[in-house]
A protein has these predicted regions:
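Conserved SAM/SAH-binding beta-strand->alpha-helix loop
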Residues: 108-110
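Short, glycine-/aromatic-enriched active-site segment of Class I SAM-dependent methyltransferases
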Residues: 183-201
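Conserved alpha-helix/loop element of class I SAM-dependent methyltransferases that forms part
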Residues: 34-77, 88-91, 95
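Conserved SAM-binding strand-loop segment of SAM-dependent methyltransferases
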Residues: 123-136
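A short glycine-rich, Lys/Arg-flanked "PGG" loop and its adjoining helix->strand segment in the class I
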Residues: 161-176
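A short acidic, Gly/Pro-enriched loop at the edge of an enzyme's catalytic core
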Residues: 74, 135-147
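Conserved SAM-binding loop
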Residues: 115-116
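Short alpha-helix
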Residues: 202-217
Length: 249
């Protein structure tokens, strides 16, 4: 299937999600009809953390809570890939403080508009949202970032290694990548556009996922957390698992 067709389908789906505010996402909890805040809590977010961010930024589209594993420090620069309405950007902004900076990257205009409004309405001065394609070119300078985070986004890309190479490019030496994503027990036997844009068919087998990270030049790629997705049901004939992965430049 053509990569551009897949990318357009993903943009359309997440554009709708940006407009609807949380009823058309790939999270298992959204599929079950749970509210965005409950879906986020079920994905691993701390309930008190959820209360500390703009409620409009919680759309329940994640499959984990990477900020809690990133060990962010005051004054650091952080980039969130596929930042959506901004939940992880705003959580990171609290961790890095006024001397730090958090940049959210998204390819959908609707999500960017929503995130920027959330930032304006809630007085965030250390965040910025930029439009970009994370496989082609992340709009961030080389060697300028302390940490890259992402939540249930890399599975949506058509070339994972290119996305990981872009992450490595923008990270400083010794910088870390901490991402939450979905992986499978084996490669997809066929591709369905709806399932891909729902974070399923683009999910790699776990070993292939880690190999893509290493192929991009990262060191010490390891799984920090692994949890059942959709209660272990087979999706598209595969068992899907949510993982949080860390690697270092």
């Amino acid at each position: 299937m053509e990569k551009d067709v897949i990318k357009q389908k993903v943009k359309e789906r997440y554009g709708r999600l940006g407009l609807s505010g949380g009823s058309d996402c790939c999270s298992s909890d959204c599929c079950s009809g749970d509210s965005p805040d409950k879906a986020a809590a079920n994905a691993g977010y701390d309930v008190q953390d959820l209360k500390s961010v703009p409620q409009e930024s919680i759309i329940g589209a994640g499959c984990g809570a990477p900020v809690g594993f990133a060990n962010l420090q005051k004054g650091e620069t952080v980039v969130d890939l596929g930042s959506g309405a901004g939940i992880d950007v705003f959580l990171s902004a609290k961790s890095v403080g006024g001397a730090g900076q958090v940049i959210g990257i998204d390819m959908t205009d609707e999500m960017l508009e929503k995130a920027r409004k959330n930032a304006r309405d809630n007085g965030y001065s250390n965040v910025e949202f930029r439009k970009g394609d994370i496989e082609a070119r992340i709009p961030v300078d080389d060697n300028s970032v302390d940490a890259v985070i992402s939540n249930c986004v890399i599975n949506l890309t058509t070339n994972k290694t290119d996305a990981f190479k872009e992450m490595r490019r923008i990270l400083k030496s010794g910088g870390r990548m901490v991402i939450s994503d979905l992986v499978a027990d084996r490669k997809a036997s066929s591709i369905d556009l709806e399932r891909w844009s729902s974070c399923i068919d683009g999910a790699l087998a776990k070993d292939d996922y880690l190999a893509s990270i290493r192929m991009a030049g990262f060191k010490d790629a390891r799984v920090l957390e692994e949890r059942e997705f959709m209660k272990g049901e087979l999706i598209g004939g595969r068992k899907i698992t949510s993982i949080i992965v860390k690697a270092v430049k």
